[in-house]
Amino acid sequence: MNKNKNYINKNYWESYYSKKKSPQKRSSFALFCKKHVRNYKGTIIDLGCGNGRDTFYFNKLNLKCIGIDKSKVIISKNKKKKKSDFILFKRKNFSKCNFDKMVNNKFSIYSRFILHAIDENTEKKLFKNILSSKKLEYLFIEARSINDKLYGIGKKVGNHAYITTHYRRFIDPKKLKSKLSMFFNIKYFNEAVGYSKLKHDNPSLIRVIAKRK
C-alpha cells in the first residue's frame, strides 16, 4: 500500500478506536468458526484484531490466542482488558511477522475483514509470510467480495480498490479460491449476504476455512 493510502487508513482506524464505541460482542464469523476451533490445541492468531472482540471470545473457549494490530491505541486498550495468560496482544505489521517465532506449537490464522483492507502487494507479502511457516494449520477468512454493494463507490486507487473514508479492496472469490487451492485443502468456501448485518450495511462476504496441505 502506498504511503498516501496507508496514511488514510492509519488515521481512520486510530480515530475510530479513539472516539467511537466499536462493537464488543463477538462477530458472527467467530461464532461460525466456533465448532471448528472448539477443541483446537494450537494458537489462534487474529490478524487485524481491532478491539479484540473475537480474540477475547476465542480465549473464553479456552483457546490460546494472539491478537495483532498496527493501531497503538487499540493494542494498549486490549492489553489493559486482558485477564488471561493465554491471550496476548501485539502491535505489529502482520505482513512481516515471523509467526513461527511467536508460538511454541501449531497455529491457525483468523482473518476477518482484513484481506479487503490491504492492497495486493501487502496481500502477496502476507501469504508469502504465512506459507513460509512450518507450524501453520488452518486459515479462517472473511472478506468483502467484488459483488458487494459498496463496490465502485469512492475514488478508484487500484484493481477493485476504492477509497471513501478509508481504503477497501474488494476480493474476487474465484481468484481467491484458485490461489488458496494451490497450498490448502478447502474445507469451506461460500459467498453470501446476511453474514454480517450492521444497521444499513449488509455486505456480500466470502467465507473460507482451509487446511494447509
Residues covered by each model-derived region:
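A conserved beta-strand element that flanks and buttresses the S-adenosyl-L-methionine
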Residues: 110
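Hydrophobic pocket-lining residues that define ligand/cofactor binding sites across diverse proteins
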Residues: 134
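Hydrophobic adenine-recognition pocket in adenosine-nucleotide-binding enzymes
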Residues: 114
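Class I (Rossmann-like) S-adenosyl-L-methionine-dependent methyltransferase catalytic domain
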Residues: 1-101, 118-125, 129, 137-213
